[in-house]
Regions:
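Beta-loop-alpha module in the N-terminal Rossmann-like domain of NAD(P)-dependent dehydrogenases
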Residues: 52-96
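N-terminal Rossmann-like dinucleotide-binding module
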Residues: 1-49
């Protein structure tokens, strides 16, 4: 039975690379489930690199995935709304 923390990363900008490398480094305890970003070109690159599901809509991702943790690597101006949405879905959150 796999008992890893299931993670989604939201936002594929510069800071997300630090989180992706940490997830890879601790692959025995963490599992990247999906990635969300509004930029479809970035999503395509990330899908090829990490071979996980991708979403362009946070709400859709939260409805469709069973996650333990969401890492928000998005612009600070939208953190509050995204944090509340994740909390309403019962997901733990790291806000960059």
């Amino acid at each position: 039975m796999e008992n890893k923390i299931k993670i989604a990363v939201v936002g594929c900008g510069h800071i997300s690379s630090k989180h992706f490398s940490s997830i890879e480094k601790h692959h025995n305890k963490l599992k990247l489930i999906c990635i969300c970003d509004s930029n479809k070109d970035k999503l395509l690159l990330m899908k090829k690199k990490f071979k996980v599901k991708t979403y362009s809509n946070l709400n859709e991702m939260l409805k469709n995935e069973k996650l333990d943790l969401v890492v928000l690597c998005t612009p600070s101006g939208i953190h509050a709304d995204q944090t509340v949405l994740c909390a309403k879905h019962g997901v733990n959150i790291i806000v960059e």
